[in-house]
Amino acid sequence: MYKCLRCSKYFQNKRRNSNLEQNIFKKYVWQRQTYTDLASEYGRSTKWVQRTLDKIETKNIVTINRQPVVVVADVTFFSRKNGLIVFREPNLRKNIWWKFVPYERVDIYELGKKHLEKNGFTIQAIVLDGKPGVRHAFTGIPAQMCHFHQKQIIKRYLTSNPKLEASQKLKEITATLTDTNEQIFTEQLIAWYETWKDFLKEKTNNPETNRWCYKHKKLRSAYRSLKTNLPYLFTYQKYPELNIPNTTNSLDGFFNSLKSKINVHRGLSRKRGMKVVVELLKGKKLPK
């Protein structure tokens, strides 16, 4: 703060204040310093720290040259109706589009696709976790189904230790997913079905409704999942020049790191929390 010798008024250096605010904000986000830590460092109150953080304006912009991109896309939720959709370029290790959302719907993915295309980006391939309908938002673009999520789907239907021999065999085939190719995997899946197709057709009577239903519903669902997703399980092998990952691990890992950093600052207001998330989405910038 400066005093004018002529009029005796005090003035603030706005640029200096702005730099100070940015420095405090980056320490708060990237160094995980709390209100108390920052108040102690700057010799001020925690209320002053909070007011300083609230002055910060974050821009939903990431700087990246227009270019063809491979996109890993998914939604994560911090609480009910408080979610975040992110498009990440795994080869660049950058988040290139995001939006806070209350739910996960196909039209939100379409919004992200249109935004990138409007700004001069070409999506060469998309990696998804297999949620129903999302692939339709990227019609005409090579789509890769995440191997980890496919294995989790099978595990959910068959459990970790299935008792039925048919389930055990199908689980063994699924376990080879990351170490095989489309031809071998397809042949194994067809051979499994030929062996167990009569078993899959077995029905039982429900005495309460007096209706017939399939006896091995979960096993049928597990097989149907593999059969439905088969055209998208080995896309990464068909386009080696694009370096398409076969999992969404790049984005899953970022989400885990994001939530870990946010949890340090529990009790954040929604507005302040969104500022922190946007700063983390844009990438690490250490304070000076």
Specify the residue positions occupied by each region the protein language model found.
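RNase H-like nuclease fold core
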Residues: 48-132, 136, 229, 250
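Acidic/histidine-rich catalytic cores and adjacent linkers
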Residues: 21, 25, 121-132, 138, ...
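Short acidic, glycine/Ser/Thr-rich loop/turn "cap" segments at secondary-structure junctions
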Residues: 21, 33-37, 94-98, 174-178
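Short, positively charged, Gly/Tyr-enriched micro-motifs
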Residues: 1-82
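Conserved beta-strand -> loop -> alpha-helix junction used to position metal-binding or nucleic-acid-contacting
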Residues: 125-171
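Short, surface-exposed beta-strand-loop junctions and turns on beta-sheet-rich folds
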Residues: 10, 141-144, 264
